[in-house]
Amino acid sequence: MAMRTPEELSNLIKDLIEQYTPEVKMVDFGIVFQVGDGIARIYGLEKAMSGELLEFEDGTLGIALNLEANNVGAVLLGDGLKITEGSRVRCTGKIAEIPVGEAYLGRVVDGLARPVDGKGAVQTKDSRAIESPAPGIVARRSVYEPLATGLVAVDAMIPVGRGQRELIIGDRQTGKTAIAVDTILNQKGKGVICVYVAIGQKASSVAQVLNTLKERGALDYTIIVMANANEPATLQYLAPYTGATLAEYFMYTGRPTLTIYDDLSKQAQAYREMSLLLRRPPGREAYPGDVFYLHSRLLERAAKLNNALGEGSMTALPIVETQEGDVSAYIPTNVISITDGQIFLAAGLFNSGLRPAINVGISVSRVGSAAQPKAMKQVAGKLKLELAQFAELEAFSQFASDLDQATQNQLARGARLREILKQPQSSPLSVEEQVASLYAGTNGYLDKLEVSQVRAYLSGLRSYLANSYPKYGEILRSTLTFTPEAEGLVKQAINEYLEEFKSQAKAA
């Protein structure tokens, strides 16, 4: 290699100097003067924006929430154990974003969409802001497609449509999560992407849900977002928005999605904790003044998009826990007013053996009836009224000794209709199975059986229909209408199986 002369070297250096353009990079730095309980107070950061991501010396991220006269209050997205007084903080100029994409299906992630299932990193190119704006009025269309839950009580009387927000509300241990998980199981083979968000739950409860979904092959189309009870309040507050963001990716690619928030009471409590530590003024039940906005901006992201945007949808099933059935508390009333209806679960019904323990009287679906399949409307039209009258009569009959025959008949019919609504956990039914059961009940065919025999008979009838009259199922699946031909087949099957069932009962 030839040695360069001093002249050549000086010319080379001159060229490099001429090509150099000085760059001045301004970084807004601040100093931590107080840290603890997941909150940091910082001097400086005069150009920080509300909701901006901040980076601490040890790599921990935070979000600027309080912009005060001489300091910034930030919440930490981690334990922050290495942050001390005097630590430096810098603005990033970004807001909280998470990666999104197909690769998340079947994965378990934390409140910032980081995998926690030990299956390695999630390979994806796209990302979305955690706090994305909800679709506007022009971007939406009215709810018109059904989202079948597989539960007779819900699909017949409180139907849910794709793009709807339907609240599941009740005391602890009344089966709220069971309804949500059954709905996920029932989406198998229907192309619906499900996101289950566990907020402030025990790790064992989330593991139980995960195992149920795995066993039933439902994890392939489901994402689980978890912010357990032992995680910082910030992650419990962000987890629902992360779940909505993951679902939005699929919604904007034209697919139906289902998001379950289990439960929003815990998110509100985490937000209350953060707000009180940030010294924000407390309001009713010590919640901050913007706790309504906390839930409204989350649930407004659920929508049915119009044709131009690909007709995707996000259906939200938020869960709220009540204390002693008190639906007039602050968070329950807020979420009831935001959602398009509620499924109310009563502890008394649950303990009396009616499961799912849905109180039909005060449960309602404000937009779902437009999405209910025609076949279901045909057989379940008067069901809610009949059950309400039965509940009234049942209460009255406890005090009356001699009842006329018509009242006795109505009580007998009501008891059998109530049996139709009972359903074991993790066994959702298809529309054709539900229609056959309801037709048998509302037309008096079950009156010939003892109340204790009804569930066994209906279970056998469903198998008998599938094996002996497959055409009935084909008609309902293709037309979603209870045609005269389908009705004839069901009548025939009911009568035939009734004789068979009675002879089996006698033999036993």
From Swiss-Prot:
One of its GO terms (biological process) is proton motive force-driven ATP synthesis. The record marks S363 as: Required for activity. Pfam families: ATP-synt_ab, ATP-synt_ab_C, ATP-synt_ab_N. Keywords: ATP synthesis, ATP-binding, CF(1), Chloroplast, Hydrogen ion transport, Ion transport, Membrane, Nucleotide-binding, Plastid, Thylakoid, Translocase, Transport. It is an enzyme of class 7 (translocase). GO terms for cellular component: chloroplast thylakoid membrane; proton-transporting ATP synthase complex. ATP binds at G170, D171, R172, Q173, T174, G175, K176, T177. It catalyses: ATP + H2O + 4 H(+)(in) = ADP + phosphate + 5 H(+)(out). It comes from the Eukaryota. GO terms for molecular function: ADP binding; ATP binding; proton-transporting ATP synthase activity, rotational mechanism. InterPro entries: ATP_synth_asu-like_sf, ATP_synth_asu_C, ATP_synth_asu_C_sf, ATP_synth_F1_a_nt-bd_dom, ATP_synth_F1_asu, ATPase_a/bsu_AS, ATPase_F1/V1/A1_a/bsu_N, ATPase_F1/V1/A1_a/bsu_N_sf. Its EC number is 7.1.2.2. It is a peripheral membrane protein. It is found in: Plastid, Chloroplast thylakoid membrane. F-type ATPases have 2 components, F(1) - the catalytic core - and F(0) - the membrane proton channel. F(1) has five subunits: alpha(3), beta(3), gamma(1), delta(1), epsilon(1). F(0) has four main subunits: a(1), b(1), b'(1) and c(10-14). The alpha and beta chains form an alternating ring which encloses part of the gamma chain. F(1) is attached to F(0) by a central stalk formed by the gamma and epsilon chains, while a peripheral stalk is formed by the delta, b and b' chains. F(1)F(0) ATP synthase produces ATP from ADP in the presence of a proton or sodium gradient. F-type ATPases consist of two structural domains, F(1) containing the extramembraneous catalytic core and F(0) containing the membrane proton channel, linked together by a central stalk and a peripheral stalk. During catalysis, ATP synthesis in the catalytic domain of F(1) is coupled via a rotary mechanism of the central stalk subunits to proton translocation. In plastids the F-type ATPase is also known as CF(1)CF(0). Belongs to the ATPase alpha/beta chains family. PANTHER family: ATP SYNTHASE SUBUNIT ALPHA, MITOCHONDRIAL (PTHR48082:SF2). This is ATP synthase subunit alpha, chloroplastic. The lineage of its organism: Eukaryota, Viridiplantae, Chlorophyta, core chlorophytes, Chlorophyceae.
